[in-house]
A protein has these predicted regions:
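Transmembrane alpha-helix boundary and packing residues in multipass membrane permease domains
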Residues: 18, 22, 33-34, 51, ...
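Short alpha-helical transmembrane segments in multi-pass integral membrane proteins
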Residues: 1-15, 72-137, 185-242, 298-363, ...
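N-terminal transmembrane alpha-helices
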Residues: 2-34, 38-39, 52-71, 96-103, ...
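Helix-terminus/linker motif at the lipid-water interface of multi-pass membrane proteins
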Residues: 23, 27-45, 114-121, 177-188, ...
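Short runs within selected transmembrane alpha-helices of multi-pass transporters and secretion channels
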Residues: 65, 134-152, 160-171, 193-209, ...
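Small-residue-rich hydrophobic transmembrane alpha-helices
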Residues: 44-107, 141-160, 259, 272-336, ...
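Transmembrane helical elements of multi-pass membrane transporters/channels
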Residues: 13-32, 133, 137, 167, ...
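Alpha-helical membrane-inserting segments
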Residues: 24, 28, 32, 36, ...
Length: 445
C-alpha cells in the first residue's frame, strides 16, 4: 500500500490532540486519587469506591453522546453544515436527560448500594458525598460532550486539546484547595476531590461556550437561537448511541466480573491484576484516540461519498496503531518488571504482575486492530452489528473461556488474562470481517 503523506499528516494532526486531551482527563483522575490518599486511607478508599461506581455510568452515557460525532462529520462531508446545530442542540437535551436519570439513580439507590458493599462507616460516608459531587460534575461533563463534537468536527481537535490542557491545572489547584483547605476553602478531604471535579467541568463547559460563541464557523448563534429539535434526530441518536453505550457498558461490566473471580486468589494477585490492568488502560489511550480520529475523518469522507478516501484513511489508521503497537509491545515486554514496580514494591506482586503484562502485550496487538475499526465503522454510522459482534467476543467467547481455563484447566489467575486475549482477538477478527463487508457494500451501492 502506497502512503499519501498529506493524508497521514492529517490523520496524525487529528489524532494527537485527541490523545493529549485523553491524557489530561486521566491526569485529573490521577490527581483525585493521589491527593485524597495524602489525607487518609479512608479518603482514598472512599474516592476509589465512588469512582468505581461512577465509571460504568459515566462511560455508558458518553458512549450514547458520542453519536454526535459521526452525525456531524457526515453532514460536514455532505456540505450540510447548517444542519449541525440541531444535532448538537439535541445532544445537549440528551445530556440534560441523562443527568436527571443519574441524579434519580443516586437518590434512590446510593444508600442500598453502599450498604451492600459492607464498607467501614467513614469510607461509606466519603464515597456517598464524593458521588453527590459527581452528580453535579456529570451534568457538565455530559454537556461538554456535544460541544466537543462540534469543535472537533467543524473546527479541529486541537481546540478541545487546548481546553482540556487549560482545565488540568485548574483541577489540580481546586483539588489542593478543597481537599486540604487552602486559600479559604474548607478542608473536605476526598469529598473535596469531587467538588474540584464539578467546578473543573463547569469551567470546561464555559470555555467551550466561549470558543463556540466567539467564532462564527461554530454557528453559536444558530445553536442557541432556537430550542428546536426533531424526532428523526433523536431516532438517529438512539440508533447510533444505544449500541455504542451498550458496547461500552458490556466491556466495563466484563472487567468488573473478572475482578470478582480474581479475588479468590488473594491480595497479592488482586494488586498485580489491578496494576497490569491500569497500565493496559493507559496504553489503550493510543488506539482509542485513533478510533476517535477515524470516526471524524472517515465520517467526513463517507458524507462526501468519497469512499476511496474513507478506505485510505481506514488503512492509514490501522497502520498507525499497529506501528504504535510494535513500540508499546516491545517496551511492555522488555520493561515489564520495572512497570509493575511503579505500582508496588512487593516481590510477589511484581512477579505476578510482570507475567500478566506478557498477556497484556497480546491484548495490545488485538486492541490496536479492534479499536480503530470500531471508530471507522462509527464513521459509516454502523453501530448495531458491531455491538452484537462485541457481545459474541466478550460474553460468548471471553468470559466462558476464562471460567474454562480456571475451573477445568486450572490455569489459576492467568486464566482471566488468557481469556481477555482470546476475547479481544476474536473481536478484532469479527470487526475485520464487518469492515470488509461494509466497504464492499458502499462500493456496490
Amino acid at each position: 500500500m502506497s502512503i499519501n503523506l498529506s493524508h497521514l499528516k492529517k490523520l496524525i494532526a487529528t489524532m494527537i490532540p485527541i490523545l493529549i486531551a485523553q491524557v489530561s482527563t486521566v491526569g485529573m483522575n490521577f490527581m483525585d486519587s493521589t491527593m485524597s490518599g495524602h489525607v487518609s486511607a479512608n479518603d482514598l478508599a472512599g474516592v476509589s469506591i465512588g469512582a468505581s461506581l461512577f465509571l460504568p455510568i459515566q462511560t455508558t452515557a458518553m458512549g450514547l453522546l458520542t453519536a454526535a460525532t459521526p452525525m456531524a462529520a457526515q453532514l460536514m462531508g455532505k456540505k450540510e453544515k447548517e444542519s449541525i446545530p440541531m444535532i448538537i442542540r439535541t445532544g445537549l437535551y440528551l445530556a440534560l436527560l441523562l443527568s436527571f436519570l443519574f441524579a434519580l439513580l443516586y437518590y434512590l439507590l446510593i444508600d442500598t448500594v453502599l450498604e451492600g458493599l459492607s464498607l467501614a462507616p467513614a469510607v461509606s460516608s466519603i464515597a456517598k458525598d464524593y458521588m453527590l459531587a459527581l452528580v453535579g460534575a456529570f451534568l457538565f461533563e455530559m454537556l461538554a460532550m456535544p460541544l466537543r463534537s462540534l469543535t472537533d468536527t467543524v473546527g479541529a481537535t486541537t481546540i478541545s486539546m487546548r481546553l482540556f490542557l487549560l482545565a488540568l491545572p485548574v483541577n489540580g489547584l481546586l483539588n489542593y484547595a478543597f481537599i486540604f483547605g487552602k486559600w479559604g476553602a474548607p478542608a473536605l478531604g476526598g469529598v473535596g476531590a469531587g467538588i474540584a471535579t464539578l467546578l473543573t467541568y463547569v469551567f470546561l463547559v464555559l470555555l467551550f461556550l466561549a470558543v463556540i460563541l466567539s467564532h462564527k464557523p461554530f454557528m453559536g448563534r444558530a445553536l442557541f437561537s432556537s430550542p428546536e429539535s426533531r424526532l428523526f434526530v433523536w431516532k438517529e441518536y438512539m440508533a447510533l448511541g444505544i449500541p455504542n453505550a451498550l458496547g461500552v457498558f458490556m466491556e466495563t461490566s466484563l472487567f468488573g466480573f473478572i475482578i470478582v473471580f480474581i479475588t479468590k486468589f488473594g491480595t497479592e494477585t488482586i494488586a498485580a491484576h489491578q496494576a497490569a490492568l491500569n497500565f493496559s488502560g493507559i496504553i489503550y489511550m493510543i488506539p482509542m484516540s485513533c478510533s476517535m480520529a477515524m470516526t471524524i475523518l472517515v465520517g467526513y469522507e463517507v458524507g462526501a461519498r468519497r469512499y476511496d478516501l474513507a478506505r485510505e484513511y481506514s488503512r492509514l489508521g490501522l497502520l498507525t496503531t499497529l506501528t504504535g503497537a510494535a513500540i508499546t509491545i516491545t517496551a511492555t515486554l522488555l520493561f515489564r518488571q520495572e512497570i509493575i514496580s511503579l505500582y508496588s514494591t512487593d516481590p510477589a506482586v511484581i512477579a505476578l504482575g510482570s507475567l500478566f503484562l506478557v498477556y497484556c502485550a497480546g491484548w495490545q496487538l488485538f486492541d490496536d486492530i479492534a479499536a480503530p475499526i470500531q471508530g471507522i465503522l462509527r464513521g459509516y454510522k454502523d453501530a448495531k452489528v458491531p455491538f452484537f459482534l462485541m457481545l459474541i467476543a466478550y460474553w460468548f467467547v471471553c468470559f466462558p473461556s476464562g471460567l474454562f481455563f480456571d475451573y477445568v484447566l486450572s490455569h489459576g489467575p492467568e486464566s482471566y488474562w488468557q481469556c481477555i486475549d482470546l476475547g479481544v482477538g476474536t473481536s478484532a477478527l469479527l470487526l475485520i470481517g464487518r469492515l470488509w463487508w461494509i466497504e464492499r457494500k458502499v462500493t456496490r451501492d
